[in-house]
Structure formats: structure tokens, C-alpha cells
């Protein structure tokens, strides 16, 4: 009998080999994974009927058996009609098939995907195996530069370390307001699933504890299926398709885990008009930070990946940082190295904060200076962050001005932070080992672009200020 790991490896290889074949026909990896998702759900529904005698969740005439009976152009027509019907349902199925469209219009290749799925028994496969196969495909898609999917993918080792630090508990609610393919929610679920709890709490974890939001229909489909394959949200998806920033949070949550999108809002997005926000700004990351600050219950805690400019930007950035220190306990900042994200040149940090008490001191862990990771030769692994997690839990300062000035873990009293220009949190103390800048051209260009955007926003704010002075 094949082991779970061998089943996982062989099936992943099989699925990805077909992806490579379809790519040669102009069918991108993202389109392939989306169609795979649509078809896999149909197949698992059919297995549920056949093996367990359950009633099909798919309307008669549009089930798996109906689809595989067709060939040629009739197959394409039947598939497209099925997608249209299912996208209009108001349940988990409707979420998975949100704005579903067929992207494999050549019958021979559509049949290949259907045949591959039909050859396997998916429902009886261990949930962890199904989920691992699907996640590995999502990760491979994130690595594909042409797909652009890397923007939705946070490195799993970083997610795991963040969850280990936040320590979510059974009975708590966990939200990711920019959930991508669901990595944070799934990791939090796995973490809590291992805790002993009553049946009531286990049911709560499966059906009500998790909540994700994303404004891209395709990503909502992938996230919903990712969680469904792990047994989460079997009746209604915990993922909703909307723009988190457009309205005030309807409910408060215990835990927030997120890596909101960097950069400006996409073209065509609704302008942010939030009376509950502390300050008006067009900076996407600052708006997400405000939104998450307002989402937390008293006693709630958050771990959020944010770019460097959030730490030092003037104007709105300074206002938000002051509110964060005043109304929240911003207790820890993890400074991340470049080279760990699929989008090149990203300089980011993880901010850990809780609601209820003002900040008294901030602990910094510098995992950036003299740290070099690349996706090809020195990929970030969970063990690379072991020392940080240990420091986070133990709170014993490693830095010592005389004996260990290169120590990566040190604390600053909040008064010292407030006294800094613009209440800047952009702090480094470790002297680099060399003077050579070994960043790639892409990383250098990204850094220049980031600084240019910051300067541009500062000029805009200054122009507004001068205009107000002239009017008065």
C-alpha cells in the first residue's frame, strides 16, 4: 500500500506534469489550477454520493457523471453551462465557483484534465494528503513569475513562525482580511486542531472560527477550495469576496494574521471613505493597518507583515504609529530579509501587537542585517526562525552594548521611540559585516521605487499644506 507521502508526491507530479503540457498550449498555470478546482469539486461530490449514499449538492443534469459522458465540443458546452449554473448558487458551491469561466476551450485538453481527476478516488484520501497536494500546486504556481500569483503567497515557514508566536486557542476567532489562498487561516487551523477540546469547540473551529476576505474572485475560489479540502467550511465557505477596506468591520475578532498587498490600490477600486479611520491616506498598507487595529477585540492580538515604509513614513504614517503605541501594545517587530518573497526586492517586517494596554517597550529582532536568502539557493525554512520564536517567548535581551553589540534581539522603551523623528520604528543597530551591497538589480530597483513613492507622497502632503496656508 502506498504511504501518504508517496501518494502525495506521485499525485503532485502527475498534476503538475499535465500543467506543463497545457502550458505548452497557452493555458497558464493559474487558469489550469482554477479549472482543476472546479472539476475536483464535482468529482468529490460524485464520490460522496457513490460511497456514502449522500444526496448530491450539484443540481441534476450538471453532475460529474453528466459531464464525463460528453466528448468534443459538446463537452466544452456542458462544462461551461455547469460553471454558469453553479456560480449562481448561494452557498459554499457558489463561493468556489465565483464568476467561474472555462479557460480550456480545446476539448482534447479539457478531457485530459477530466480523465486525470476521474482516475483517482479523492474523497477517501486523507484530508492532510489532499490538502498538501493542493497547497503544493498553489506554491508552485506562486513561484511561476508569469502567473503573477506570488503576490498572494506568503512563505509557509514565516506563516508557521507567526502562528507559533500568536498561539491561537480553541474557541477564538481568527481573521485574515487579505487572505490570498488561505495560508494563514489553514496554518492557524492546524495549530488549534492539535489542542484538546470538546466536540462543541471542535465544531466551532471547523465552521465558525475562521474568516477570510479577498477582493479577487479567482483567489477566493482557490482559498475556499484549499480550506474545503482540509475539511473546513463544508457547508459555507469562511472566505468572502469583497474589499476589506470599503466598510467598517461588522464583527471584532480575537486574532488577526495577515500579509496585506503592498503598493497602491488597484485601478478601478472604490476610494476609501472610512469615518472610523484615524487618518485619511491613499497608502494601501497604512489603510490595512488601520482596518486591522479596528477589527481587534479588547485583548485580541495580531501579527501582520508590512513593508518598511509603514515604519517611517511621515504624515499619515506618523499619526497611525502614534495611535498604535497609544492604544495598543506594539510589543514586537521582526525585521525580515529580502529574498524570501516571490515578489523580488520586498523589504518587510512583522508587527506583533495586542489591544487593551498602551505600549511600554518594543522588542526588535533583526533578521535582516547580514542575512541572505534566495528562493533558489538558500530558501527560508522554519528552523531559520527558531531563534526568533525562542526570543519572542522568553523575552531575554541578547544585545549588550559592550559584550554583544551584534546581538539580534533587543528592546527599546517607548519614550525613546516617541522621541525619534516622526516616531520612526525603522531601527537598526547591527553593523553589517561588509560594505558591498549584494542586492540584485531587481531588489535595488524595488528599493528605489519604494523610496520614490514615499517622496512623492510627502511632496503631495506638503503641497496640500501649502495650499491650505495660502487659502488662509
UniProtKB/Swiss-Prot annotation:
InterPro entries hit by this protein: D12N6_MeTrfase_N, DNA_Adenine_Mtase, DNA_methylase_A-5, DNA_methylase_N6_adenine_CS, SAM-dependent_MTases_sf, T1MK-like_N_sf
Stored SUPFAM superfamilies: S-adenosyl-L-methionine-dependent methyltransferases
Keyword terms: DNA-binding, Methyltransferase, Restriction system, S-adenosyl-L-methionine, Transferase
Biological process according to GO: DNA restriction-modification system; methylation
EC supergroup of this enzyme: transferase
Origin superkingdom: Bacteria
Note from the entry: Type I restriction and modification enzymes are complex, multifunctional systems which require ATP, S-adenosyl methionine and Mg(2+) as cofactors and, in addition to their endonucleolytic and methylase activities, are potent DNA-dependent ATPases.
PANTHER family: SLR6095 PROTEIN (PTHR42933), TYPE I RESTRICTION ENZYME ECOKI METHYLASE SUBUNIT (PTHR42933:SF4)
Family statement: Belongs to the N(4)/N(6)-methyltransferase family.
Assembly, per entry: The type I restriction/modification system is composed of three polypeptides R, M and S; the restriction enzyme has stoichiometry R(2)M(2)S(1) while the methyltransferase is M(2)S(1).
Protein's UniProt name: Type I restriction enzyme BthVORF4518P methylase subunit
Amino acid at each position: 500500500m502506498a504511504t501518504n507521502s508517496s501518494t502525495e508526491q506521485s499525485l503532485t507530479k502527475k498534476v503538475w506534469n499535465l500543467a506543463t503540457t497545457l502550458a505548452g498550449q497557452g493555458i497558464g498555470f493559474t487558469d489550469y489550477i482554477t479549472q482543476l478546482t472546479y472539476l475536483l469539486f464535482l468529482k468529490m461530490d460524485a464520490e460522496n454520493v457513490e460511497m456514502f449514499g449522500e444526496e448530491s449538492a450539484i443540481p441534476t443534469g450538471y453532475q460529474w457523471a453528466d459531464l464525463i459522458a460528453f466528448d468534443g465540443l459538446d463537452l466544452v458546452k456542458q462544462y461551461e453551462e455547469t460553471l454558469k449554473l453553479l456560480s449562481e448558487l448561494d452557498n459554499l458551491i457558489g463561493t468556489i465557483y465565483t464568476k467561474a469561466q472555462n479557460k480550456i476551450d480545446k476539448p482534447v485538453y479539457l478531457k485530459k484534465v477530466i480523465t486525470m481527476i476521474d482516475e483517482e478516488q479523492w474523497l477517501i484520501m486523507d484530508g492532510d494528503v489532499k490538502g498538501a497536494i493542493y497547497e503544493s500546486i498553489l506554491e508552485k504556481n506562486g513561484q511561476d513569475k508569469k502567473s503573477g500569483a506570488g503576490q498572494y503567497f506568503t512563505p509557509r515557514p514565516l506563516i508557521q513562525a507567526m502562528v507559533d508566536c500568536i498561539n491561537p486557542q480553541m474557541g477564538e476567532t481568527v481573521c485574515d482580511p487579505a487572505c490570498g489562498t488561505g495560508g494563514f487561516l489553514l496554518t492557524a487551523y492546524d495549530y488549534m486542531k492539535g489542542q484538546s477540546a470538546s466536540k462543541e469547540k471542535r465544531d466551532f473551529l471547523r465552521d465558525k472560527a475562521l474568516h477570510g476576505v479577498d477582493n479577487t474572485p479567482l483567489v477566493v475560489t482557490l482559498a475556499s477550495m484549499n480550506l474545503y479540502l482540509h475539511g473546513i467550511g463544508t457547508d459555507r465557505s469562511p472566505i468572502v469576496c469583497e474589499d476589506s477596506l470599503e466598510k467598517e468591520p461588522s464583527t471584532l475578532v480575537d486574532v488577526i494574521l495577515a500579509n496585506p498587498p503592498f503598493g497602491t490600490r488597484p485601478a478601478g477600486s472604490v476610494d476609501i471613505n472610512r469615518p472610523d479611520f484615524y487618518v485619511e491616506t491613499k497608502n494601501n498598507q497604512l489603510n490595512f493597518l488601520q482596518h486591522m487595529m479596528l477589527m481587534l477585540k479588547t485583548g485580541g492580538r495580531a501579527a501582520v507583515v508590512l513593508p518598511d515604509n509603514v515604519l517611517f513614513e511621515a504624515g499619515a504614517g506618523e499619526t497611525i504609529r502614534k495611535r498604535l503605541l497609544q492604544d495598543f501594545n506594539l510589543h514586537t517587530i521582526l525585521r525580515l530579509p529580502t529574498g524570501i518573497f516571490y515578489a523580488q526586492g520586498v523589504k518587510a517586517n512583522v508587527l506583533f501587537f495586542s489591544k487593551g494596554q498602551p505600549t511600554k517597550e518594543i522588542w526588535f529582532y533583526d533578521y535582516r542585517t547580514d542575512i541572505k536568502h534566495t528562493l533558489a539557493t538558500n530558501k527560508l525554512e522554519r528552523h531559520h526562525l527558531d531563534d526568533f520564536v525562542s526570543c519572542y517567548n522568553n523575552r531575554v535581551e541578547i544585545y549588550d552594548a559592550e559584550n554583544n553589540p551584534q546581538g539580534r534581539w533587543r528592546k527599546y522603551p517607548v519614550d525613546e521611540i516617541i522621541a525619534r523623528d516622526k516616531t520612526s520604528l525603522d531601527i537598526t543597530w547591527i553593523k553589517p559585516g561588509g560594505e558591498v551591497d549584494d542586492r540584485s538589480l531587481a531588489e535595488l530597483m524595488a528599493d528605489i521605487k519604494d523610496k520614490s513613492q514615499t517622496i512623492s507622497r510627502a511632496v503631495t502632503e506638503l503641497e496640500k499644506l501649502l495650499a491650505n496656508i495660502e487659502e488662509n
